Amino acid sequence: LPGIQTMTLSATQRAFIFLILALVMAGTRINHFAAIPDASWAVFFVAGFYLRGSWRWAFALLIAIAVLVDLLVITGQGLNFWQHYCVSPAYWFLLAAYGAMWAGGAFLRKFHTGSAAQGLGLLATCLLVSASVCFVISNGSFYWLSSQVATRSFAGWVENMGHWYFGYLRTSVMYVLLATGLHLVVSQLLRTRSGAVQISGRG
């Protein structure tokens, strides 16, 4: 990811990024498992990358937005939020699950050095590890704590994870790759613009 070390974001730029991420999460979270895959995992990863440090409070606000969207969707269907099968004791483990995604993005931003190839390698590693931890927390907490699972066993949990893991990973990779592409395009445009300004200034 070229330009990470020298990329300094203004408060306005960070606010714009936060707004875009919040809208993407809200817009896709409404459609859980529908035609548009939920981007929540990727949103927290990308937010950790761009908003770590002085904007870390954005994590709590994104969590609040996620809960609000769930509340609106469930009650909009005429159902009781607290009695919905998704809102089991495992629901609150999403704090830790999404925290893993945020931490993955923050780690990438903090420790990336070297070439673009090395950056992409670290991106792949951070995303794989954080998404896997996120999945184990969210899937495991639901399997072991939700009343939806009648008979629990370790073998059953492993089988259940096998059914869902790659789908969630694929969705996260898809959205993060899209964000990476946008990052590279914008970085290139900014460098081109900066170079044009310098050339114009010399004239």
PLM regions: where:
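Interfacial aromatic-anchored transmembrane helix boundaries in multi-pass membrane proteins
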Residues: 29-37, 64-101
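Alpha-helical transmembrane segments of multi-pass membrane proteins
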Residues: 25, 66, 70, 102, ...
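Short, Lys/Arg-enriched N-terminal segments with co-localized hydrophobic residues
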Residues: 1-6
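Hydrophobic alpha-helical transmembrane segments
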Residues: 15-20, 56-60, 91-96, 120-128, ...
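Membrane-embedded alpha-helical hairpins and interfacial helices in multi-pass inner-membrane proteins
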Residues: 107-195, 199-201
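Hydrophobic core segments of transmembrane alpha-helices in multi-pass, intramembrane catalytic enzymes
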Residues: 40-44, 93-101, 175-179
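Structural signal for the C-terminal ends of transmembrane alpha-helices
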Residues: 27-28, 46-54, 100-113, 181-190
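Hydrophobic transmembrane alpha-helices
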Residues: 7-51, 55-60
